[in-house]
Amino acid sequence: MKTLFASVSENVQFVLLCLAVTAAVVLLAWGGEKLVMKKRHRLNAAHTITTVGMLAAISGVLMVIELPLFFAPPFYKLDFSELPVLICAFSLGPVAGVVCEFLKVLIHLLLKGTSTAFVGDLANFLVGCSFVLPASILYQKLLSKKGAVASLALGTGVMTVFGSLFNAWFLIPRFAAMYGLPLDAIIAMGTQVNGAITDLPTLVLLAVVPFNLLKGVLVSVLTFFLYKRVERLFFRRAKQS
């Protein structure tokens, strides 16, 4: 906890930027929710807050469990923390999904702190939202099994495109600068696992794109098969009241 507070005090401007970006994403989610959930019956506030908190806690713990990938540098690791967030967004709407995403990152910070001066944490939040937001907005409009498939496919596609561009434009160069490394040193980590990676575009194409695509597909499949079961567990009594 002390380490986290020290990191906040050392990076006040960037933390404020993170909060501003979070507020902007919440507003975007609120607009999408108003558009597709105008006359939908809503759960009471206490149950919503409790459910979002529980799913965020599960996500925060899942975020700690990371799996290395054979085709990507060691700083790209797979986790399934988006699964509870997607279930939250499908059940309660885009705003709840974004709040759950934010709390997930916050819980992870409390558990492990930050080793990236919050840059990686902001990236995780934004890339996660690029998956959850479009998927949940479309699902809330369609509300069917076919709609769920289309929504998850859309979310995976948006996350893959956004995550890849965000890595190329901001994240990889920022990490290189933060650790005082030339960009070539980051690329060399990719070359070690795949000789075809020789520059930033091939690093993104051969490591970042497959990473986001694999994560999106796996989380989507799990969400499709688990969503209704988890929804019944968390939401049945509240919806009957």
Where do the model's predicted regions map?
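Loop-helix junctions at membrane interfaces
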Residues: 1-241
